[in-house]
Amino acid sequence: MSMQDPIADMLTRIRNGQAANKVAISMPSSKLKVAIANVLAAEGYIESVKVLEGAKPELEITLKYFQGKPVVESIQRVSRPGLRIYKRKDELPKVMGGLGVAVVSTSKGVMTDRAARQAGLGGEIICYVA
């Protein structure tokens, strides 16, 4: 059976992996998933990202904890296949008053809301992370 929303599945695997105190999680890889994971790693929400090549590439994410607690407090899908959410540069949301990040897919690639605002770009709001 095909997966309807692979990005939501990725976010759920991260959420469940941290709830179970897993060191690392793996999932089927795609360019968008790797780009989202790289943004999360750059922002310090996950430890590392690795793509395991093969007939079906796997994405391995090493989760991050601080004093035994998960670094990611909440991770929430915003734009979904049934209802895409697009925002202009001046409409980009600030997650938790700037403490969290919104992951945005722009014409220049996947980036945080802060980076998109600086670059003067809008795009599809993929998820909120806090």
From Swiss-Prot:
GO terms for biological process: translation. It holds the Pfam family Ribosomal_S8. The keyword Cell wall biogenesis/degradation does not apply. SUPFAM superfamilies: Ribosomal protein S8. InterPro entries: Ribosomal_uS8, Ribosomal_uS8_CS, Ribosomal_uS8_sf. GO terms for molecular function: rRNA binding; structural constituent of ribosome. Keywords: Ribonucleoprotein, Ribosomal protein, RNA-binding, rRNA-binding. The keyword Methyltransferase does not apply. Gene3D superfamilies: 3.30.1370.30, 3.30.1490.10. One of its GO terms (cellular component) is ribosome. It comes from the Bacteria. PANTHER family: 40S RIBOSOMAL PROTEIN S15A. HAMAP family: Ribosomal_uS8_B (MF_01302_B). Belongs to the universal ribosomal protein uS8 family. Part of the 30S ribosomal subunit. Contacts proteins S5 and S12. One of the primary rRNA binding proteins, it binds directly to 16S rRNA central domain where it helps coordinate assembly of the platform of the 30S subunit. This is Small ribosomal subunit protein uS8. It comes from Actinobacillus succinogenes (strain ATCC 55618 / DSM 22257 / CCUG 43843 / 130Z). The gene is rpsH.
